[in-house]
Amino acid sequence: MGIRKYKPTTPGRRGSSVADFAEITRSTPEKSLLRPLHKTGGRNNSGKITTRHKGGGHKRQYRLIDFRRHDKDGINARVAEIEYDPNRTARIALLHYVDGTKRYIIAPNKLSQGDFVEAGPDADIKPGNNLPLRNIPVGTVIHAVELRPGGGAKMARSAGASVQLVAKEGRFAQLRLPSGEIRNVDVRCRATVGEVGNAEQSNINWGKAGRMRWKGVRPTVRGVAMNPVDHPHGGGEGKTSGGRHPVNPNGKPEGRTRRPNKESDKLIVRRRRTGKNKR
C-alpha cells in the first residue's frame, strides 16, 4: 500500500492524503458473503446516546469474516482477491477453497492474489496460515489471535497490528502485545502467521472534518464551550476552566474507565506502560 498526497487546490485538500489502493484487485464484494448493516447513531434500544460522536456516514454492507477457520483444517485455499472493507482499517482476502467454499479473512502483509493458504496444526509457518499457538515457533509474529480456544480471533485485527509469541510454558503461551503488555494465552488458541497488512493506514491525513463525517464520526465539542443545560462544565461569564474535575455530560468522572478486578487480569504477566510513569 502507498499513500497519495493531494495538491493544495483547496483549504480542505491542503495536506490531506489518501490510500492509493494499489493492492486492491476487485472493486465489488462477494455477494454471498454480504449482510445488511444497520446504524445505531450511538443510541441504545431506548434511544439514549451511549456513545458520543457517532452518526451519519456512508451506507455500508457487512462482510462476513472467518475469524475461526477451525472447520477448514487441512483444506487448501487460493487467494482469489484482495478487497477493500469499509468496516475495518485492514484489507480482506477472498479465499476459494478446493471444496468450493468461499470465505473472507483479514489480509496479512505479503499475501498476494494467487497465493495458497491453509489452516490446521500441520500448516506451514507462512503469512496467512492459521495454526494453534502450540504449533507456532517462539519468536513468530502473528495476528488474529484467539483469547479462548474456539472463540474466534479477538486480538491484533486492525491495519498494521501484530503480536509476537515470546515464550511457551505448560498450557500457556506468552504474547507481547503492541502496547508492550505480555499476556498468557492458552496454547490451544489459534492465530494467523504474519502481521496485518495496510500498515500505512495510520499515516493518512484526513484533511477536513467532512471526510470524517463520511466515516460516521461526528464533532467532539468541549464541555466548557457548552451551556449549563448541555454539560456540567458549561456556562459562566467569559471563558472558564469548568470549575470542577473533568466529568462526562452525565456528571460522572472522566478517565479511569477500566475495571481493576477483571477476571482475565490474572493472565497478564507484565502490564502495559501507561501515563506519565512509564517504565
Curated annotation (Swiss-Prot):
Keyword Amino-acid biosynthesis: no
Classification via HAMAP family: Ribosomal_uL2_B
A Pfam entry, by short name: Ribosomal_L2_C
Any single biological process term in GO: cytoplasmic translation
Name this polypeptide is given: Large ribosomal subunit protein uL2
Cited function: One of the primary rRNA binding proteins. Required for association of the 30S and 50S subunits to form the 70S ribosome, for tRNA binding and peptide bond formation. It has been suggested to have peptidyltransferase activity; this is somewhat controversial. Makes several contacts with the 16S rRNA in the 70S ribosome.
Assembly mode: Part of the 50S ribosomal subunit. Forms a bridge to the 30S subunit in the 70S ribosome.
Single Gene Ontology MF annotation: transferase activity
Family stated for the protein in its record: Belongs to the universal ribosomal protein uL2 family.
PANTHER family documented for this protein: LARGE RIBOSOMAL SUBUNIT PROTEIN UL2M (PTHR13691:SF5), RIBOSOMAL PROTEIN L2 (PTHR13691)
Sequence ranges of Basic and acidic residues compositional bias: 253-268
This protein's GO CC annotations: large ribosomal subunit
Regions of compositional bias (Basic residues) in chain numbering: 50-59, 269-279
Gene symbol of the encoding locus: rplB
Region Disordered: start-end pairs: 29-59, 224-279
